[in-house]
Regions:
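Surface-exposed coil/turn segments at beta-strand junctions on protein surfaces, enriched
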Residues: 18, 76-79, 95, 126-130, ...
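Extracellular beta-sheet/turn segments enriched in Thr/Pro/Gly and aliphatic residues
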Residues: 16-41
Length: 203
C-alpha cells in the first residue's frame, strides 16, 4: 500500500512487485474541496484545543526511523476557527536527530480527511528535559463548528536507536495504523494545543 497526503492511496498486489528489483509507480493526485473564503477578525489568539489533565506516564516512540503509527487527540470545536499555532510538549528525546509530523484531519464516519495541504514538520535534536514546541501554521486552516477533528502525530525520520517521550494527558485520543488505517480509541493521549482566532464567512 502506497499512501501520501497529496495523492490517492494506491494498493499494489504482491505478485506485481515480488519478482522485480524496481517498480515504477504513478500516483493519482488527490483533489479536495477548499473551505469558503474567510475573513479573520483582528483579535488576539485564543485557545481552540487544550492539552487536558496530566495523566501518569508518557506516550513514547522507541527505536523508529519511520513509524507506521500516529497518535493524537480527537475533538470537536464549538465555533468556526482559523488556526494559527500548534503547540506540543516533549518530555525527552534521546535521538541525535528526529523529525515529527503533525496532520490535522476532519473525521467523517470512519474516514480521516486531511484539512491541510501540507503536513507540519518539527525537527528536534537530543532533549534531556521537557521542551515546549510551537509551530506557526502559514496556510489558511479553518475548523468548522460542530465538526469532529483528529491531530495525528508521528515520527517520520530519526537518526536510529533512541526514543522520544511526550507527557500523557487525559483526553479522548486515537492511535492509527498508517498502513492498514486501523484505529483504536484511548482515554489518554499526548498533549497538543491549538490556538487561533474566530472566523466568519465572507458575505
Amino acid at each position: 500500500m502506497i499512501s501520501h497526503i497529496s495523492y490517492q492511496t494506491s494498493k499494489i498486489p504482491c505478485d506485481v512487485y515480488s519478482k522485480k528489483t524496481s517498480l515504477q509507480l504513478t500516483l493519482k493526485e488527490k483533489t479536495c474541496d477548499l473551505s469558503d473564503i474567510t475573513v479573520v477578525s483582528g483579535k488576539k489568539q485564543e485557545s481552540i484545543l487544550g492539552k487536558g489533565v496530566r495523566a501518569p506516564g508518557d506516550v513514547a516512540f522507541h527505536n523508529v526511523r519511520n513509524t507506521k503509527y500516529e497518535t493524537g487527540p480527537l475533538f470537536v470545536v464549538n465555533k468556526d476557527y482559523y488556526v494559527k499555532t500548534a503547540k506540543l510538549r516533549v518530555q525527552k528525546c534521546t535521538f541525535a536527530s528526529c523529525t515529527i509530523r503533525l496532520i490535522i484531519y476532519e473525521v467523517k464516519g470512519t474516514n480521516f480527511m486531511p484539512v491541510q495541504h501540507r503536513p507540519l514538520y518539527v525537527r528536534l535534536s537530543e532533549i534531556s528535559d521537557k521542551k515546549d514546541l510551537s509551530v506557526w501554521i502559514e496556510e489558511p486552516l479553518k475548523l468548522e463548528r460542530n465538526h469532529k477533528y483528529y491531530i495525528g502525530v508521528a515520527v517520520m525520520a530519526s537518526s536510529g536507536n533512541g526514543e522520544i517521550h511526550f507527557p500523557a494527558y487525559f483526553k479522548k485520543g486515537c492511535v492509527r495504523n498508517l498502513c492498514t488505517d486501523r484505529k483504536k480509541n484511548l482515554p489518554v493521549t499526548l498533549g497538543v494545543s491549538l490556538y487561533g482566532i474566530s472566523a466568519k464567512h465572507l458575505q
